[in-house]
């Protein structure tokens, strides 16, 4: 149990620090009345043209998910490319299988029209 003491101490310190950082702003804040102008969106000194929490097109969400997936692909390819001279054929073909699966997924999304902005 003694080998877990540093982990427990750091966990307790981080929890205490988090609680302190959550409580201190409430202690030092002033309880002034809030005006509707302070709660509205600020648009460079002009009156707001619309609601700040407006809906956005679902295609933006889809493109962001696709970006994250293919960005993670690059993070997997970088260590593979750095150690390319040291890996054997199994490492090469496993990465080619990974690339094939991602390419099939990309072609599927392209075929379904996920990347079209009509």
UniProtKB/Swiss-Prot annotation:
Entries under Pfam families matching the protein: Oxidored_q4
Entry membrane topology: Multi-pass membrane protein
Spans traversing the lipid bilayer: 7-27, 62-82, 87-107
One GO cellular component, as annotated: mitochondrial membrane
Entry's EC annotation: 7.1.1.2
Catalytic reactions on record: a ubiquinone + NADH + 5 H(+)(in) = a ubiquinol + NAD(+) + 4 H(+)(out)
Subcellular location: Mitochondrion membrane
A GO molecular function held by the record: NADH dehydrogenase (ubiquinone) activity
Primary enzyme class: translocase
Key words of the record: Electron transport, Membrane, Mitochondrion, NAD, Respiratory chain, Translocase, Transmembrane, Transmembrane helix, Transport, Ubiquinone
HAMAP family recorded: NDH1_NuoA
PANTHER family found in the cross-reference section: NADH-UBIQUINONE OXIDOREDUCTASE CHAIN 3
Family: Belongs to the complex I subunit 3 family.
Function: Core subunit of the mitochondrial membrane respiratory chain NADH dehydrogenase (Complex I) that is believed to belong to the minimal assembly required for catalysis. Complex I functions in the transfer of electrons from NADH to the respiratory chain. The immediate electron acceptor for the enzyme is believed to be ubiquinone.
Protein name: NADH-ubiquinone oxidoreductase chain 3
UniProt source species: Oenothera berteroana (Bertero's evening primrose)
């Amino acid at each position: 149990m003694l080998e877990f003491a540093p982990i427990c101490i750091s966990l307790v310190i981080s929890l205490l620090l988090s609680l302190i950082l959550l409580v201190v702003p409430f202690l030092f804040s002033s309880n002034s009345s809030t005006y509707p102008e302070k709660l509205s969106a600020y648009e460079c000194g002009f009156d707001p043209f619309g609601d700040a929490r407006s809906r956005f097109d679902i295609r933006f969400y889809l493109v962001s998910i696709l970006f994250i997936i293919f960005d993670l692909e690059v993070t997997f390819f970088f260590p593979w490319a750095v150690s390319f001279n040291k890996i054997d054929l199994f490492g090469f073909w496993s990465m080619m299988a990974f690339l094939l699966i991602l390419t099939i997924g990309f072609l599927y999304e392209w075929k379904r029209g996920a990347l079209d902005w009509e």
